[in-house]
């Protein structure tokens, strides 16, 4: 490369130097050609100074070339500009040999300074500094060459002028390029910032992109609003509640349908677009959690929306009820929407606009109109309260049904409610799992599993599985169970499990407020009662349409009411601490001799069914009701009906809340006086609405279902125990599990007590060492059965008959009859706390259950007719003359511990069976004394009749029957007790 540059310089100077310089240039060419070869020798010191200068020159070029060529604008400089460096070096060589070392030193110093600069600083300075340094170097070399080389400078002056002009031109060009490059950089930076701003604004517009959401409200109107596409469900729900002026909003939710025939609840914690894939966004506003006691709601507007939801449930068939119930609820609907009955305006009301029942008939409209006349004076809020008080006692109130199949492929329905999980088959409730009884809920693919707590005598937990249509249905059911358990049972929501690495299964947990938190927040509501228009009638909710003298004051719910002229009267049924009012004119019951039962094959049990669920199938009963043309006829049939069994006092005490206790006295006083007056007329006063039989406890129970018989659970557990609920290898979409933490609230203790009652119904083991048996012997007891295997049958049988007891007998409800003290002392040590009021579970008459304060002193009224005898027992026993006779038999083999130390109580069970003239109560206790298990059976038989009995014969028959029924046990004690009052005799 050096040779080419040197020869090119000589060609340019050929016109000025002709002869003498030619030989010198040739010698220089030879030396330049030999320079690469002589470089190793120069390093060893064999060459003089000038070759060292030539050696440093290529290194300088190499050092100067590499950085400049690798960065900046130097890559775009044409080659003829880069050759100027070699041209200057050639001129320096011609100037003289003495200055060459100095030139090399200067170049090395300048290059050393350049290389010592930081790389970042040299890059920032760019190519402009590099060109300035080169120019400075060339100027210094030329100045130093001027004195010793005058001749050569004169000869080369034109060439230098040309070179200077070219260098200035090159410098100007480079400066212009550098300035242009800087301007371009600034322009690019500005453009980039503008583009970024535009992109950011575009992104902002994309983020604020709105989607139209439409919500169908409970009154049929539609609410629309624009939402951000990334908005969460809570935003939409809050807007809807704000539009409705609703504060108690935790009972409600939004439903959407993303798949045919399947609706899902909108999760407020997730984005809507992640839950609802399709546009437009369509939702329906519904009640999600049905309040077990609507009277505890604070605002009327909340009760109004609950009424609207229940009307939809009734019209769609989700909430089945009888013809009479349809008519009663429809009459309250008319009263709330249109006010008092007005014959002039009634013709203008189109009852076809109201869907009172799935099958809307003309006869139903007539019955609704007749009942509407009796509600004069009720405000809309009061009518809604009465509507809810009757609707909450329906067996399917608040039950969310899901289609499923059991292990044998039989179609069933799983119902989720406030108290637990219900199993329905052919519209019959065949099983119930309370929340305290469930340990874990899980799903895997399309299978749904519940792990049930083992019974007292069981060692292993049982898992019951159900097959759902698909995995979405299984996940939806699982979510509903998680939400219901958290809302009704927990004090505060459970936090989602912490996310771990590579964990499977759903992390879903209920994120809203629980019922306890909602009630606490409701007490803090401090605003005037909101006024709202009812959609169907445009009637203002808080207006009263006149209040005649006989107005029934029913608001707030729970306060007493005084029956006035033309106003429906109420009969109060004391429920421990709360009184339940039922209209006597409104809900007639058909006469029924016995409760219908369903026998389950393979198990010695009866499964009670809900009468309300089967009323639509009972055509004969419906036909009878349809022939009743007037209110008086309805009342007569209602009075003649057989009362249905009532829950035990223990069940009632567990259910009823405390705030209603102070109001019981006034209700009882008013209604007992009314009962006395009616009893004087001679009517059988056993008044109760159809919805009230056993439903005072809580929603989800069938009417009258105060005792739970659940051997079906053991059957399912056996058949499904091999199925696994493991979720270790499934994705989040197909697997989820939930283990309830039973942090109960104040109002949920009743399920725990129900579970204890269920466990006490376990069959006792046989082969005990000592048996003590108390029995009174009737002439014939057809429904007394032997052994523990028939205990569930005896349990069910007691619900079929109305108890007919003398006032003097000692009943399970704390009766006041005189009793042998020895017998009392013998029975009391074996009774579990809470079991005494549980003995005669449904045996008392339906009117007054009198074991709880306040005490109202009344006289006892006995009503007798030719076909039926029913006595009403009160707390005060009339003073009568009685004759008592007691015969006691004690075995000489009595065990010493039988009457003394009772040992450790394991289980206690009480079974009551009744027939027309006989009541049999069996009390079974299992204790452990000194490591020995002892089963003790005490049977008490009460016979009501006029015939005289031979006590000796009764005693012998009792001993004989006891030994025949239990040959492996010994009879230790038999007591025959006879009480004679006037002309009637009672034996115990």
From Swiss-Prot:
Tissue: Widely expressed.
One MF term in the entry's GO annotations: spectrin binding
A Pfam family it matches: SAB
InterPro entries (alphabetical): Band_4.1_C (IPR008379), Band_41_domain (IPR019749), Ez/rad/moesin-like (IPR000798), FA (IPR014847), FERM/acyl-CoA-bd_prot_sf (IPR014352), FERM_2 (IPR035963), FERM_central (IPR019748), FERM_CS (IPR019747)
Disulfide bond annotation, renumbered to this chain: none
Sequence positions bearing Phosphoserine: 7, 38, 86, 116, 201, 379, 395, 492, 543, 555, 561, 582, 610, 630, 698
UniProtKB keywords: Acetylation, Actin-binding, Cell cycle, Cell division, Cell membrane, Cytoplasm, Cytoskeleton, Membrane, Mitosis, Phosphoprotein, Transport
Region (Disordered): 1-190, 514-594, 639-788, 804-839
Gene Ontology BP, a term: cortical actin cytoskeleton organization
Residue(s) carrying Phosphotyrosine: 606
Residue stretches in coiled coil: none
Main localization (coarse): cytoplasm
Region ranges (Spectrin--actin-binding): 652-837
Segments for region (Hydrophilic): 495-651
Annotated positions of the N-acetylthreonine modification: 2
Composition bias, Basic and acidic residues: 22-31, 110-148, 160-190, 673-686, 704-717, 739-751, 828-839
FERM domain boundaries: 211-492
Region described as C-terminal (CTD): 838-988
Described purpose of this protein according to its UniProt entry: Required for dynein-dynactin complex and NUMA1 recruitment at the mitotic cell cortex during anaphase.
PANTHER family reported for this sequence: 4.1 G PROTEIN, BAND 4.1-LIKE PROTEIN 2
Protein name: Band 4.1-like protein 2
Taxonomic source organism: Mus musculus
Gene: Epb41l2
């Amino acid at each position: 490369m050096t040779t080419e540059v040197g020869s090119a310089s000589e060609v340019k100077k050929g016109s000025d130097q002709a002869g003498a310089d030619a030989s010198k240039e040739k010698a220089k060419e030879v030396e330049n050609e030999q320079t690469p070869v002589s470089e190793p020798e120069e390093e060893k010191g064999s060459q003089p100074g000038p070759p060292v200068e030539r050696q440093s020159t290529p290194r300088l070029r190499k050092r100067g070339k590499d950085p400049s060529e690798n960065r900046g604008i130097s890559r775009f400089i044409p080659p003829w500009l880069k050759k100027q460096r070699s041209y200057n070096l050639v001129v320096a060589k011609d100037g003289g040999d003495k200055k060459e070392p100095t030139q090399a030193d200067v170049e090395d110093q300048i290059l050393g300074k350049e290389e010592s600069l930081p790389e970042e600083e040299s890059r920032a300075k760019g190519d402009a500094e590099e060109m300035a340094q080169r120019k400075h170097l060339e100027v210094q070399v030329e100045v130093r060459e001027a004195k010793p080389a005058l001749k050569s400078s004169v000869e080369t002056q034109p060439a230098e002028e040309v070179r200077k002009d070219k260098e200035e031109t090159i410098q100007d060009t480079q400066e212009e390029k550098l300035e242009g490059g800087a301007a371009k950089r600034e322009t690019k930076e500005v453009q980039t910032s503008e583009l970024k701003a535009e992109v950011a604004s575009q992104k902002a517009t994309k983020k604020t992109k709105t989607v139209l959401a439409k919500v169908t409200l409970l009154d049929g109107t539609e609410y629309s609003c624009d939402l951000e596409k990334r908005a969460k469900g809570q935003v939409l729900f809050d807007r809807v509640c704000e539009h409705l002026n609703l504060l108690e909003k935790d009972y409600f939710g939004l439903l959407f349908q993303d798949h045919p025939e399947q609706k899902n609840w909108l999760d407020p914690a997730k984005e809507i677009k992640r839950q609802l894939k399709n546009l437009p966004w369509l939702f329906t506003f519904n009640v999600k959690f049905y309040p077990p006691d609507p009277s505890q709601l604070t605002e009327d507007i909340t009760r109004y929306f609950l009424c609207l939801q229940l009307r939809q449930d009734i019209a769609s068939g989700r909430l089945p009820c009888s013809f009479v119930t349809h008519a009663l609820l429809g009459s309250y609907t008319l009263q709330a929407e249109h006010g008092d009955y007005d014959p002039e305006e009634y013709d203008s009301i189109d009852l076809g606009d109201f869907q009172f029942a799935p099958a809307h008939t003309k006869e139903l409209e007539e019955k609704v109109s007749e009942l509407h006349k009796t509600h004069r004076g009720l405000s809309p809020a009061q009518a809604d309260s009465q509507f809810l008080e009757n609707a909450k006692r329906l067996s399917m109130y608040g039950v969310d049904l899901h289609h499923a199949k059991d292990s044998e492929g039989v179609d069933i329905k799983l119902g989720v409610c406030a108290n637990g999980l219900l199993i329905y088959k052919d519209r019959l409730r065949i099983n119930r799992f309370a929340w305290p009884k469930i340990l874990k809920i899980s799903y895997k693919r399309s299978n749904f599993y519940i792990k049930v707590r083992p019974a007292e005598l069981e060692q292993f937990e049982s898992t019951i599985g159900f097959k759902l249509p698909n995995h979405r249905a299984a996940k939806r059911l699982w979510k509903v169970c998680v939400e219901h358990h958290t809302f009704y049972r927990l004090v505060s929501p459970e936090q989602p499990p912490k996310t771990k690495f590579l964990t499977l299964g759903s992390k879903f947990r209920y994120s809203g407020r629980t019922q306890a938190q909602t009630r606490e927040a409701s007490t803090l509501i401090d605003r005037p009662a909101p006024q709202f228009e009812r959609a169907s009638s445009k009637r203002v909710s808080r207006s009263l349409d006149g209040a005649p003298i006989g107005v029934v004051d029913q608001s707030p719910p729970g306060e007493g009411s005084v029956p006035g002229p033309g106003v429906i009267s109420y009969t109060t049924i004391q429920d421990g601490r709360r009184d339940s009012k039922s209209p006597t004119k409104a809900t007639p019951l058909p006469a029924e001799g016995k409760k219908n039962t369903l026998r389950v094959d393979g198990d010695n049990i009866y499964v009670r069914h809900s009468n309300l669920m089967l009323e639509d199938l009972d055509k004969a009963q419906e036909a009878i009701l349809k022939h009743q043309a007037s209110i008086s006829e309805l009342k007569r049939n209602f009075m003649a009906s057989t009362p249905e069994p009532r829950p035990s006092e223990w069940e009632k005490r567990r259910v009823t809340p405390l705030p209603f206790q102070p109001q019981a006295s006034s209700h009882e006083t008013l209604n007992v006086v009314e009962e006395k007056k009616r009893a004087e007329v001679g009517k059988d006063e056993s008044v109760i609405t159809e919805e009230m039989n056993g439903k005072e406890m809580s929603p989800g129970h069938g009417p009258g279902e105060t005792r739970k018989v659940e051997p079906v659970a053991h059957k399912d557990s056996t058949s499904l125990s091999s199925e696994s609920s493991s979720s270790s290898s499934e994705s989040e979409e197909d697997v989820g599990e939930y283990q309830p933490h039973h942090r109960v609230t104040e109002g949920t203790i009743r399920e725990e007590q129900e579970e204890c009652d269920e466990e006490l119904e376990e069959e006792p083991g046989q082969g005990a060492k000592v048996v003590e048996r108390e029995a009174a012997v009737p002439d014939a007891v057809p429904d007394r059965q032997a052994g523990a295997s028939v205990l569930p049958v005896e349990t069910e049988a007691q619900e079929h008959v109305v108890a007919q007891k003398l006032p003097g007998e000692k009943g399970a409800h704390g009766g006041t009859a005189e009793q042998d003290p020895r017998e009392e002392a013998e029975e009391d040590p074996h009774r579990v706390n809470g079991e005494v009021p549980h003995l005669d579970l449904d045996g008392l008459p339906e009117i007054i259950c009198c074991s709880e304060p306040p005490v109202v002193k009344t006289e006892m009224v006995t009503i007798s007719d030719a076909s039926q005898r029913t006595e009403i027992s009160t707390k005060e026993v009339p003073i009568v003359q009685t004759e008592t006779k007691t015969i006691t038999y004690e075995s000489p083999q009595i065990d010493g511990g039988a009457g003394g130390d009772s040992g450790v109580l394991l289980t206690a069970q009480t079974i009551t069976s009744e027939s027309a003239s006989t009541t049999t109560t069996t009390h079974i206790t299992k204790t452990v004394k000194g490591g020995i298990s002892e089963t003790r059976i005490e049977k008490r038989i009460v016979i009501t009749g006029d015939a005289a009995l031979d006590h000796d014969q009764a005693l012998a028959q009792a001993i004989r029957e006891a030994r025949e029924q239990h040959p492996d046990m010994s009879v230790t004690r038999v007591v025959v007790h006879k009480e004679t009052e006037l002309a009637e005799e009672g034996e115990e």
